[in-house]
Curated annotation (Swiss-Prot):
In the N-terminal section; belongs to the Fmt family. UDP-L-Ara4N formyltransferase subfamily. In the C-terminal section; belongs to the NAD(P)-dependent epimerase/dehydratase family. UDP-glucuronic acid decarboxylase subfamily. UDP-alpha-D-glucuronate binds at residues 393, 398, 432-433, 460, 492, 526-535, 613. One of its GO terms (cellular component) is membrane. The record marks D140 as: Raises pKa of active site His. Pathway: Nucleotide-sugar biosynthesis; UDP-4-deoxy-4-formamido-beta-L-arabinose biosynthesis; UDP-4-deoxy-4-formamido-beta-L-arabinose from UDP-alpha-D-glucuronate: step 1/3; Nucleotide-sugar biosynthesis; UDP-4-deoxy-4-formamido-beta-L-arabinose biosynthesis; UDP-4-deoxy-4-formamido-beta-L-arabinose from UDP-alpha-D-glucuronate: step 3/3; Bacterial outer membrane biogenesis; lipopolysaccharide biosynthesis. This is Bifunctional polymyxin resistance protein ArnA. The active site is at H104 (proton donor), E434 (proton acceptor), R619 (proton donor). Gene3D superfamilies: 3.40.50.12230, NAD(P)-binding Rossmann-like Domain. It comes from Sodalis glossinidius (strain morsitans). It catalyses: UDP-alpha-D-glucuronate + NAD(+) = UDP-beta-L-threo-pentopyranos-4-ulose + CO2 + NADH; UDP-4-amino-4-deoxy-beta-L-arabinose + (6R)-10-formyltetrahydrofolate = UDP-4-deoxy-4-formamido-beta-L-arabinose + (6S)-5,6,7,8-tetrahydrofolate + H(+). NAD(+) binds at D347, D368, I369.
Length: 660
């Protein structure tokens, strides 16, 4: 059986060796060059390939059409991936006749993603293992062929556990490779209800928070100990690394981080204490804990810190253009509640943000982005993060005022992007679910779905294309000039303060606000083309929490990423939305103060939106990136969002004094 192997690290060596021993014909091995910044403690797949006269390649992008063609020419029966660090595209996965299989270092479906070896130790797990599974477009989600569990003892660290997993992998492959060759394997689908995801770990993850329990910190130490970068803290301004530690019972009422004794070196934690058995200072060598304490000049009662004392952390300055808008005002509320951010905002109105005006961390200027260009450039230079939230985003305006949409949504935002490039400021840019256009995928994926729009004479696409081009410009600036950016794509966010009823009166609002106005005024609810179009509605609180995590950007893992933010479980047609809204309206305490329901009326899109409109039948997001990068998933059901949105708008209507 002919195989093409994607492999790296010790697990790659184990996999290649197992295939050789099992009698597979290896047509090619694709691997990575060793990175100068990475401590190379593991075996070389390339060396094994050379010793066995197997062609070996190190492409920059294995998913490039040229490499896909080369792999196709090899006509593999089977593909194996052993700790290869790049996801393989569907075009590659579909090449082998038997299938493509991946070796993963956990007991799937738990701990999908990167670095499961370290994560299981961080989380104090007592068992892990290895899994050979069929590869699918979703990482680590395919059916399982074989697994082997590995016990984790308190004496295990990342390196000893890594060696155990390599041994387990060799055993799994020895058993299952003949069955794959003879095509007599049984496969078990993964249980999605217990799936979990973990992200890539960086050296920053080794920073010690002494407020955590000692057991948690001991797990962190063993999870990232040598040859990984290590768990670290600071004594004054000097960094030191802890290589080995153990929990010590402690009932003393001491502040976390306090040195309780020097030899042994024992430090108070959130509960119990941590004894440092070995470690080293930043400029020192590996040494015993007591000697490390002397080298650092520690005394009993000294206080250790997660960061050097000499560095004063100021609040992060965030510039929000369009701060009075739906997303802007809700985001401002979340950032101010956190307390670590200072907000600078610009908008042409203040109705939604008046509640923030007394907050000393909120600075507002009333103005237009097309006029206040100097103020904007100055504050881009001054701030750390820029969110340009100004845009015309109501469908009727795409056909009513297409040039204004282009001028504001594209031209003005392009100026802001270029200022961010000039001053090297991080930009978090609101893309849109509209960029997917008429994509036929069942779910829209940020990295793989095609962006399909209609003909030029359908002017409604000017918004989608303007946003898409800005997405591409940002991506190019990131690739060519190092711009730090994140694109987020909201999918039908709803909630209080979404537009206003006055905007709805002139047709310039989103769907739910327009529907509420119809109920308030007793006019027909117009369902464009029968309201059959399906959308996935997302509560504003869910959306803002995801956006807040993008701003936090832990581990910088949102840099250069595109992230859908939506709720695929809240899919409903516009007609269903209207029916749910009507039911909520009928049971509302203020219902009696409004006219009778006038009924639904189906209208053609051309009569409602005008010439040049074209609709989209469905729009459902993949939120794989949001789960993986943010640890986020939506939780608010659509019925709750509808109730809260309706109540907010009904409370804004002027009613007779008795009703008030």
């Amino acid at each position: 059986m002919k195989a093409v192997i994607f492999a790296y690290h010790d697990m790659g060596c184990v996999g290649v060796t197992a295939l050789i021993n099992a009698g597979y014909t290896i047509e090619a091995i694709i691997t990575h060059p060793d990175a100068p910044s990475e401590k190379t403690f593991f075996g070389s797949v390339a060396r094994i390939a050379a010793e066995h006269n197997i062609p070996v390649f190190v492409p920059d992008d294995v998913n490039h059409p040229l490499w896909i063609a080369r792999i196709k020419a090899l006509a593999p029966d089977v593909i194996f991936s052993f700790y290869y660090r790049q996801l393989l595209c569907q075009d590659i996965l579909s090449l082998p006749t038997v299938g493509a299989f991946n070796l993963h270092g956990s007991l799937l479906p738990r701990y999908r993603g990167r670095s499961p070896l370290n994560w299981v130790l961080v989380n104090g797990e007592q068992e892990t293992g290895v899994t050979l599974h069929r590869m699918t477009a979703r990482a680590d989600a395919g059916a399982i062929l074989a697994q082997r569990s590995v016990a984790i003892t308190l004496q295990d660290d990342a390196l000893t556990l890594h060696r155990k997993l390599c041994e387990a992998a060799a055993g799994v492959l020895e058993k299952v490779l003949p069955a794959i060759r003879e095509q007599r394997c049984t496969e078990t689908p993964q249980d999605e209800s217990i799936a979990s995801y973990v992200g890539h770990r960086t050296p920053e993850d080794g920073r010690i928070d002494w407020g955590q329990p000692a057991a948690t910190l001991a797990n962190l130490v063993r999870a990232v100990t040598d040859p990984w970068p290590g768990a670290f803290s600071y004594a004054g301004g000097e960094k030191f690394i802890i290589w080995k530690a153990q929990v010590r019972p402690n009932s003393a009422d001491a502040q976390p981080g306090t040195v309780l004794s020097i030899d042994p070196l024992v430090i108070a934690c959130g509960s119990d204490a941590l004894e440092v058995q070995t470690g080293q200072s930043q400029q020192g060598v590996y040494m015993q804990g007591g000697q490390l304490a002397h080298a650092l000049g520690l005394v009993k009662g000294a206080l250790l810190n997660p960061r050097p004392l000499v560095s004063h952390k100021r609040r992060t300055r965030v510039l929000i253009l369009g701060v009075n808008g739906f997303i802007g005002n809700h985001l401002t509320e979340r950032l101010l509640r956190d307390g670590n951010y200072e907000i600078y905002g610009l908008d042409i109105g203040t109705d939604a943000i008046s509640r923030f005006m007394v907050n000393p961390l909120f600075h507002f200027v009333e103005g237009d982005i097309s006029i206040h260009s100097e103020w904007i450039e100055y504050h881009i230079k001054k701030c750390d993060i820029v969110l340009p939230l100004v845009a015309i985003a109501t469908p009727i305006e795409y056909t009513r005022n297409p040039l204004r949409v282009f001028e504001l949504d594209f031209e003005e935002n392009l100026k802001i992007i270029r200022h961010c490039v000039k001053y090297q400021k991080r930009i978090i840019f609101p893309s849109t679910s509209e960029v997917y256009g008429m994509c036929t995928d069942p779910v829209f994926d940020e990295d793989d779905s095609s962006l399909i729009v209609g003909p030029i004479n359908k002017q409604r696409w000017i918004y989608s294309v303007s946003k898409q081009l800005l997405d591409r410009v940002l991506w190019a600036y990131g690739e060519k000039e190092g711009l730090r950016f994140t694109l987020f794509r909201p999918f039908n966010w709803m909630g209080p303060r979404l537009d206003n009823l006055n905007a709805a009166r002139i047709g310039s609002s989103r769907a739910i606000t327009q529907l509420i106005l119809n109920l308030v005024e007793g006019s027909h609810i117009k369902l464009v083309d029968g309201g059959a179009q399906k959308r996935c509605f997302t509560d504003i609180s869910d959306g803002i929490e995801a956006l807040f995590r993008i701003i936090e950007n832990k581990d910088n893992n949102c840099d250069g990423q595109i992230i859908n933010i939506g709720n695929p479980d809240n899919e409903a047609s516009i007609r269903q939305l209207a029916e749910l809204l009507l039911a909520s309206f009928e049971r509302h305490p203020l219902r009696q103060h409004f006219p009778p329901f006038a009924g639904f009326r189906d209208v053609e899109s051309s009569s409602y939106y005008g010439k040049g409109y074209q609709d989209v039948e469905h729009r459902k997001p993949s939120i794989r990136n949001a789960k993986r990068l943010l640890g986020w998933a939506p939780s608010v059901p659509m019925a709750q969002t509808i109730d809260e949105t309706l109540d907010f708008f009904l409370q804004t209507v002027d009613l007779p004094d008795a009703a008030q």
